[in-house]
């Protein structure tokens, strides 16, 4: 393995830069040339590629986003688009590729592997929705960003005696809502894995109000429904003044936590090791405190994990 390409794809997540840095420095340490592919699979198809050196990744470990930028690419989903990408890799003599991203990026990595290009996928998504790995790069930072905002909303919610609904990211996986809801002391946590029970939410809010609670917090994953509409329904049913806040893309930004920097560094270095060992079609993950790798397709076939125990604990502690 002489030349390794690295790209970031799909939604960005804090810690991607730390992973890029690990790929570049680990690769150079092992005598490889590292090529940075800009704007994901789109940049691969259009040959937006340049060689990276040690200076290319100086002072980026603490930065959010991705210096390689990212994009979604419908063209790569087509056979013609993938043939263009393969031709670019052959012309530039890129022997293997590290792909950093979420589910869609992993699908692309699998396609590259099927074309005969050794490819290693590294999980970078704030949603934590790749079931084969305990954590994905960016999830911890997103949790802490949301938790900080919850603390601020709690202050004003208490002052006004309101209920506040906080909508966070998570279309199919409610991990951000679940763990920030527990850590933030939310009265209700609404996630796709469980669904929405408006009557139960209203009952809990009224129960709290009747015993003198000054405020209530509800954390809602975006995959369940809209916070604004839910707020109107709750206010009508309970008479409790309710405000809704949609956090949106603020969750994707910011300096990564120590956990995400370390996780990204370990995963990026493992990806390079695998390619040097001529092992492609692999997904890097973490179980317990151990970095591991497995077949990409097998990784994609593992369903999102749902932490029922934590959800039940959150219910108990929210009484």
Curated annotation (Swiss-Prot):
Subcellular location as annotated: Cytoplasm
Regulation: Allosterically activated by ADP and other diphosphonucleosides, and allosterically inhibited by phosphoenolpyruvate.
Recorded metabolic or biological pathway in which this protein acts: Carbohydrate degradation; glycolysis; D-glyceraldehyde 3-phosphate and glycerone phosphate from D-glucose: step 3/4
Binding positions (ADP): 21-25, 154, 185-187, 211, 213-215
Documented EC number(s): 2.7.1.11
Residues that, per the record, bind ATP: 11, 72-73, 102-105
Main location (coarse class): cytoplasm
Catalytic activities: beta-D-fructose 6-phosphate + ATP = beta-D-fructose 1,6-bisphosphate + ADP + H(+)
Highest taxon of the lineage: Bacteria
One GO term (biological process): fructose 1,6-bisphosphate metabolic process
Record keywords: Allosteric enzyme, ATP-binding, Cytoplasm, Glycolysis, Kinase, Magnesium, Metal-binding, Nucleotide-binding, Transferase
Description of how the protein assembles with itself and partners: Homotetramer.
Family the UniProt entry places it in: Belongs to the phosphofructokinase type A (PFKA) family. ATP-dependent PFK group I subfamily. Prokaryotic clade 'B1' sub-subfamily.
Record-given protein name: ATP-dependent 6-phosphofructokinase
Organism for this UniProt entry: Alkaliphilus metalliredigens (strain QYMF)
